[in-house]
Amino acid sequence: IDSSSGALGNATYAAVGEVVPIISTAPVDAALRMKWLDRLFEAIQEDDPPYIEHLGDHWGDLCATSELASVWADQLVPTQRNVLRDRQRGNYAFFSGTTLCYSALFKAGRRDELLELLALDPRPIWQYLIWGARVLAARGQVDEAIAYVREHAGSTTRLETIARFAEDALLKVGRRAEAFDQYALLANQANSHLSTFRALAKKYPELAPDKLLGHLIASTPGEPGKWFATA
């Protein structure tokens, strides 16, 4: 059982981030990779508390090829459809392979099918609906992707989470001014004004410190003194 600080969960999350690129790029044949994935899938099913569930977000990358990802999608989609039918009937239904399914569909290039499944979910949580936004962003429909998460995100989704996605999507297509003006402050809020200022200065080096400071002061009326302390 994890401590109240969440140290074990944080360490496991970090470990997943380190392991995924190693497995994804390992020069092995499809048969061996499938054995690896079978073992990982079994581990995810038995993961309680769910320390390694984050692996599901990377399932497409772990498959390494679109062909293997499609094989996994074929295995996971039927169960996912059944779960969504139950949810539409108002029943509680959960499948620990949902993120794996969506990640595999994305990697396999089966983007329309992914959107179709998401449309069947009456209350998709952030970890699921983000895949629909990724599909739209990958198609170059950045504004639509941002609108998608704004429309479908539930009340439990923090505004900071939405802002981080929107900022990142805009930055990836070079729309830096919009990313900064509309989402940067909310997306990069840290535990102190100084930390927030430093994070923004690092991410937006094109902004002179005085201009950045002026924007932050204007964005938070009534708190100029707190920002001046960062200068």
Regions found by a protein language model. Give the residues of each.
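Eukaryote-biased, non-catalytic alpha-solenoid scaffold regions
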Residues: I1-A231
